[in-house]
UniProtKB/Swiss-Prot annotation:
Primary enzyme class: oxidoreductase
Binding site for substrate: 81, 87, 119, 153
Taxonomic path: Bacteria, Pseudomonadati, Pseudomonadota, Gammaproteobacteria, Pasteurellales
Amino-acid positions noted as binding NAD(+) in the UniProt annotation, renumbered to this chain: 7-13, 34, 94, 117-119, 231
Name of the gene encoding the protein in the UniProt record: mdh
Active site: 177
Protein's UniProt name: Malate dehydrogenase
Amino acid sequence: MKVALLGAAGGIGQTLALLLKLRLPVGTDLALYDISPVTPGIAVDISHIPTSVSAVGYSGEDPSEALKGANLVIITAGVARKPGMTRADLFNINADIVKNLVEKVAEVCPKACIGIVTNPVNTLVPIAAEVLRKAGVYDKRKLFGVTTLDVVRAKTFTSELKEKHVETVKVPVIGGHSGPTILPLLSQALSEGLPLSFTQEEIEALTYRIQNAGTEVVEAKAGGGSATLSMAESGARFAVAVFKALLGEDCVRYAYVESKEGSGYPEFFAHPVRFGLTGVEELLPIGKLSEYEQAKLGELKPVLEADIALGKNFVNP
């Protein structure tokens, strides 16, 4: 079984490559690809770490060698956010990069699952879907946007606010993966399986912080980058869990995937997902929303729908 990481020389990619080398199951092949000539060296560097995961690096314009035989492709390639940039500003550059990479996936390993980390996820996942459709290989079970960082942040910030042990806290996060489209369901937040209670002021402040945590990091790094380390850790959590699901382990994670037709949600939406041998096996119920969450859902839908339309129109002008 093989994982291909596209964008392996970037700020997220290098750390994610290290974490995958440490955490993927014994015997996994890890292929690292980036346009940068340092990529084979990154593979050599992590190959000195004593785990039973083999790493090989590829550089240049063509990722085909890295993609051959891949079961799971993780895409982190693209430019990072800088101060003053929104995720939408990234679109013009990253849309082309992801489109070209997904075209290669469609050609070389059309049955592989694809996890997109590159922002703006809301728009790039629909681009990938359209590219795969055009190639005649689209399978909605095998394409997902990685929104794990939103769940990780919700868990961390909630545990800090409520002074609970972070490992005991669970907070669902649905919607999209940009500012106002990120919707933490604090009404369903649990610690040690028991509901947590919040004042309205806490709900609003915590929701705002989770939605804008990416900007918090960009500003704190003072022009020196975006959230690379927490994103790499979140990406590793997701990739390893999904890869193990492809091997038969039970796995439920939140991810930005194609919604059920007639569900009332936008065409792509972050749901709780059961992953299995074929990728997405089941979209699980989102559960009951509070009045505040229902209002927020109503606000985010048109924003997310516009993001999705932007992606589809990019491939089909």
